[in-house]
């Protein structure tokens, strides 16, 4: 595989890239954060103060639930669950170790930091990753 990739680089002058689309869930955020986030999308991805390629494309909201005094799940109307969709490109030979900055992007990864010029969420969970779409 490495030889084939090297031949592609030599023949074309660049590495082939694979588009990666992933979704990050952020729970328990104040409801106004949703509208404010939408104002700044799409927004380029950042890590350690530098652009890393790719962008946060969109955000969707869902209810956020908490336990009440009786142990029942109820909707917290002051907070929401947010689902951010981001895209990036990674060298095709490295698709199995997709990284954005220094962070690996894998389904189930917790404590993910989603950051752009205007948006930052810590403690997110990567809930979906699609390669090549």
Listing of model-derived features with the role each one plays in the protein:
Residues 1-133:
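Beta-strand/loop-dominated core regions that host nucleotide or nucleotide-derived cofactor-binding catalytic loops
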């Amino acid at each position: 595989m490495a030889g084939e990739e090297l031949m592609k680089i030599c023949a074309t002058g660049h590495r082939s890239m694979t588009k990666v689309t992933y979704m990050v869930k952020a729970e328990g955020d104040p409801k106004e954060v949703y509208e404010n986030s939408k104002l700044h999308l799409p927004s380029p991805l950042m890590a350690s103060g530098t652009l890393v390629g790719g962008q946060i494309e969109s955000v969707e909201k869902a209810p956020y639930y908490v336990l009440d005094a009786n142990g029942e799940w109820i909707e917290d109307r002051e907070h929401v669950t947010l689902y951010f969709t981001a895209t990036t490109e990674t060298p095709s030979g490295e698709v199995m170790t997709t990284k954005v900055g220094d962070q690996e992007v894998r389904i189930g990864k917790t404590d993910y930091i989603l950051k752009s010029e205007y948006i930052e969420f810590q403690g997110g969970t990567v809930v979906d990753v699609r390669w090549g779409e």
